[in-house]
């Protein structure tokens, strides 16, 4: 059993981000960009670890601490967390209920091959 909840893997305020998006949005693209090197004359990074992250957190942790638990239990825990963090009128719990009902994360990930050198 992991000592972390999938529900706590994102900043709390991100639960309100969908309210800022236009109605009818069907696609959203995000990027992860490496920060500037802290070492002189070192301008490249190796891209690695995404496959392990997806497996451990986006599949196993999501299943163990969210999708495989009873819906009522998950929603009650999530509401308690969000109510304490951002207030009960600041979010739509229906989004979380729909995600639980879907039983998987509806994301498409496109990435460089593991081990790619990026500059």
Regions found by a protein language model. Give the residues of each.
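Ordered alpha/beta subdomains of enzyme catalytic regions
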Residues: 1-119
């Amino acid at each position: 059993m992991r000592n972390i909840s999938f529900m706590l893997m994102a900043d709390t305020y991100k639960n309100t981000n969908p309210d800022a998006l236009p109605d009818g949005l069907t696609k959203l693209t995000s990027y992860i960009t490496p920060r500037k090197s802290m070492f002189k004359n070192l301008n490249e990074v190796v891209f690695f670890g995404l496959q392990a992250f997806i497996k451990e957190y986006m599949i196993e942790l999501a299943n163990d601490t969210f999708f495989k638990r009873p819906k009522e239990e998950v929603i009650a825990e999530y509401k308690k967390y969000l109510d304490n963090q951002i207030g009960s009128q600041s979010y739509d719990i229906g989004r979380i209920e729909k995600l639980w009902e879907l039983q998987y994360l509806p994301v498409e990930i496109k990435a460089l091959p593991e081990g790619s050198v990026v500059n």
